[in-house]
Structure formats: structure tokens, C-alpha cells
């Protein structure tokens, strides 16, 4: 699939810079963090970068499947939950990290599990923005048509871009 005129391709270098900038914003909050929870799979890379920048050693994952056919969000399904020790105190002192908050459905499910956790994402669309505490880029309306899955890199060499709907108001 070729990129449309309004594509927002993200290189690994740009993504790394944006994730580091997100880490610096979180560092500016001057809080003690006990762990990071990465929303898989997209949150794994920014979580690793943020952990490194902030000196956090405990990393957990939560896996929620939503893009079953890689083109549109389907029914949400929790494939792997969060360990009990991080759920204590409703997630206080935990940073939840994802690469992109699209509709906010995934963040809402994790927010129910950890209402006092701090939610951070590298990129956010307007619909998902209210669920995020700290982000690098928000309000991606108007120029983000496609978001890279694997950031445009795939072992087969194929283009891997997930179509996303910009002006969804439902």
C-alpha cells in the first residue's frame, strides 16, 4: 500500500526522539515511580526508552487486543493482565505507556484496572486524549491518516500501515 498525501510516517529515529522527549516530560513531574506498565505491543519500545531515561527497573506488560484484522478496531479482549503487586493502591506510582492513543478504548480498560496510575503516550488523537496524563504529540487531527505498525518496518519488506479514522466522533 502506498502512502496517501496526509500520511504521518514515523521513522525509528523520530520515534526514539519523541519517546525520549516524553520521558523528559515525565521526569519534570518530579515524582517517584515504582514501575512501568507497557501496553503491548506498541508500548514496549517507548516503555524501554522511558525506563532507561528515568532509571526505572520494573517493567510489566498488559496485552489488550483490539486491532484483530489490522485495519479497524474490534471488540476489546484482555489477553494478559497486570500483576497483583502493581494493582495495589490502584496503580499509584506506576506509569502506563503506549505508543498511540487512538480512540482511548485500550487506555480506558487499563484505567479501570489502575485508576491512580499515570498514563503516558507518545502520540494521541483527540478522541483518546482525555485519558492521557502526559504525551509528546497530541491532537493529531488533520494530518494523520495512517499510523505505522512496526513504524513502517516489516521483515517481509511489505508496507505495514494501519488505517485510522481521523474525524471519528462516535
Curated annotation (Swiss-Prot):
What positions does the entry give for Mg(2+) binding?
99
The cofactors it requires, by name, are:
Mg(2+)
Q: Per UniProt, where does 5-phospho-alpha-D-ribose 1-diphosphate bind?
A: 41-42, 98-106
Q: Binding positions for guanine?
A: 102
Q: Which family does it belong to?
A: Belongs to the purine/pyrimidine phosphoribosyltransferase family. XGPT subfamily.
| NCBIfam families (UniProt xref) | PRK09177.1
Q: What is this protein's name?
A: Xanthine-guanine phosphoribosyltransferase
Amino acid at each position: 500500500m502506498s502512502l496517501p498525501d496526509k500520511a504521518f510516517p514515523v521513522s525509528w529515529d523520530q520515534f526514539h526522539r519523541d519517546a525520549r522527549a516524553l520521558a523528559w516530560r515525565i521526569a519534570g513531574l518530579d515524582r517517584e515511580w515504582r514501575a512501568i506498565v507497557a501496553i503491548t505491543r506498541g508500548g514496549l519500545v517507548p516503555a524501554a526508552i522511558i525506563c532507561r531515561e528515568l532509571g526505572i527497573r520494573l517493567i510489566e506488560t498488559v496485552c489488550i487486543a483490539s486491532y484483530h484484522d489490522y485495519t479497524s478496531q474490534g471488540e476489546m479482549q484482555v489477553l494478559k493482565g497486570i500483576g497483583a503487586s502493581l494493582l495495589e493502591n490502584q496503580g499509584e506510582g506506576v506509569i502506563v505507556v503506549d505508543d498511540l492513543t487512538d480512540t482511548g478504548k485500550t487506555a480506558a480498560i487499563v484505567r479501570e484496572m489502575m485508576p491512580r496510575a499515570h498514563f503516558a503516550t507518545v502520540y494521541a488523537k483527540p478522541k483518546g486524549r482525555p485519558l492521557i496524563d502526559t504525551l509528546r504529540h497530541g491532537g493529531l487531527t488533520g494530518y494523520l491518516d495512517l499510523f505505522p505498525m512496526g513504524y513502517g518496518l516489516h521483515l517481509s519488506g511489505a508496507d505495514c500501515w494501519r488505517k485510522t479514522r481521523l474525524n471519528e466522533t462516535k
